[in-house]
Structures are given as structure tokens and as C-alpha cells.
Amino acid sequence: MEVKIFNYLPDDAQMIRQKVFVDEQGFKQEFDKIDDFADHFVLYDGSEPIATFRIFNGEKQGEYVLGRLAVIKEYRGKNIGSDILSEAEKIVLNKKGKSIVLHAQCRAKNFYAKSGYVEFGEIGEEEGLPHIWMKKQL
């Protein structure tokens, strides 16, 4: 498996996010202005794009935001999500980052907690789906 980095939203990342967040989960406002300045990452199995995420600077010095982590259905349950978190943490450390924050769907918070992410703040909604902020010090 190979991770490719883009400073723009590539078609492969767009396709994965469309499948996962729009087609499967029903989000209507999946793509936003953050896509214009975030670094985008796509994980490939051979030439097949199978997962994506984005990273951008947070509000505080040394803080980075991880978002739009998506794995296509056929590859779920194979620890790819956990591998992505590890890769994202390495990327942030290479940028001299000190922490990662993310806005997790509440149904996925245990997945992030297993990797050391801790909840903070209030539960909010994005398009009617509960989300919680989570953070990990690196």
C-alpha cells in the first residue's frame, strides 16, 4: 500500500469521499473551502484508491486538524483506519506538530479513543449527525 500526498483535492480523494460521505451516509455538503488549502492524502492498494484524509493547520501553534478520513467499504475491517491515524501522526510530527484534533462522528469516537484520542467540548451536529471534538497530544 502506498500513500500519496497532494496540495489540492485530487479526483481519487473526491471519489472516495463521494462514495462514503455522500452516497453511503447522506451528507450533502461534503466539499468545502478547507479543501482549497488542506493537504490531501490518498492510500492506494496497487493502483486502486481505497482511503483518504486531509490535514490542515489548527487554531493553536503546533496543532493540526485531521478530517474527512474515509475508507471505501470493501476495505473496512482491515485496520486501514488505524494505519491512517498512525500515518497522520507521523506526518504531523514531521511538521513539528504537537497535537491533532478532529471532529468525529459520535458513532466513531471509540475507534479514535483506541488510538489515544480524548473527547473535549460539547457534542454538536453536522447535517443532523452528532459529532464530538477529539484531541491527541503527540
Where are these regions (language model features)?
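Conserved active-site tyrosine of GNAT-family acetyltransferases
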Residues: 17, 112, 117
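Short acidic/glycine-enriched loop/turn segments that link adjacent beta-strands
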Residues: 36-37, 60, 126-130
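A short beta-loop-alpha structural element at the N-terminal edge
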Residues: 1-13
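Conserved GNAT acetyl-CoA-binding A-motif
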Residues: 85, 91-105
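Conserved catalytic-core motifs of GNAT/GCN5-like acyltransferases
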Residues: 103, 118-133
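Conserved beta-strand in the GNAT
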Residues: 42, 48-57, 63-70
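Helix-loop element at the rim of GNAT/NAT acetyltransferase active sites that forms part
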Residues: 15-28
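Conserved acetyl-CoA-binding loop-helix of GNAT-fold acetyltransferases
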Residues: 71, 77-90
